[in-house]
Amino acid sequence: MNIFNTNPFKAVSFVESAVKKALETSGYLIADCKYDGVRGNIVVDNVAEAAWLSRVSKFIPALEHLNGFDKRWQQLLNDDRCIFPDGFMLDGELMVKGVDFNTGSGLLRTKWVKRDNMGFHLTNVPTKLTPKGREVIDGKFEFHLDPKRLSVRLYAVMPIHIAESGEDYDVQNLLMPYHVEAMRSLLVEYFPEIEWLIAETYEVYDMDSLTELYEEKRAEGHEGLIVKDPQGIYKRGKKSGWWKLKPECEADGIIQGVNWGTEGLANEGKVIGFSVLLETGRLVDANNISRALMDEFTSNVKAHGEDFYNGWACQVNYMEATPDGSLRHPSFEKFRGTEDNPQEKM
């Protein structure tokens, strides 16, 4: 398969004036639950070859065994109920069932089987005992996530020629769920081992109802909402028409160095975060990490050197951007690279 830039629709930061305008025009808004997962694009071409890709069109390490030809994709494309028989792209959120976001995203980025992920691997791997009686893996094996552990929340589907073209898909947000459900019913039938779901979605008719729904979903443990203009279409890239309603904004960047705890305070001698060069060109200190991460990062730096994490791709969260472009309360959120290549954003 020819891998292309999938460039899915990415929600922009919440802008109340723009959202109110969409509400006035349509009389209501679509509000989808925002899931804490890894954005994924599943591309299936006309010869039934599939590619499981990240939002920046990189192969997802733990799902590489699902790439390539599968007779079931061929059967699905040939099914009279398939609305895109020449191929399609699915856009959604990938999650690992039964674990939190950090664990799940870590598993999806994982390249090799280790003791702590053996339970999620598709098959058993041989083990052996060390002279001290510790069980270790006997050899080196690529990590293949068991598809039964995989959950996919679908946002959109489009024909492959539109996906390849990079053009917007002229289907309104209010109609997209019907297209998604038409495909989801087939996915459930042909690939029952994977959990295929549609994003939990609501219609809200005023801003107060939107606020109430947001607070309700936050209380349930969700990240927030994706608010959609019902009459807007599926666009490519970060465009207005989908808005993120969540406590924090996010930015991607590259680690330039580590930040150490202040002398005389409790975190003295520990790595408390990173100096990160954002894609915008601004350098920020992204700290506010857990004690467990402090211990992990400090241990790695002491073992491998202070430049161990330099060049790693990461995500920084922040409350808002000021008019001069600086960020309020930036904090380290997660690494964006793969286990095999932490410097390449997935």
From Swiss-Prot:
Q: Which residues bind a divalent metal cation?
A: 223
Q: Name one GO molecular function term.
A: double-stranded DNA binding
The entry's active site is: 34
EC numbers on record: 6.5.1.1
Matches recorded under InterPro entries: DNA_ligase_ATP-dep_cent, DNA_ligase_ATP-dep_CS, DNA_ligase_ATP-dep_T7_C, DNA_ligase_T7, NA-bd_OB-fold, NAD_dep_DNA_ligaseB
Q: Name one Pfam family in it.
A: DNA_ligase_A_M
Where, by residue number, does ATP bind?
Answer: 32-35, 39, 55-57, 93, 142, 149, 238, 244
The record's disulfide annotation reads: none
Q: Could you identify this protein by its name?
A: DNA ligase
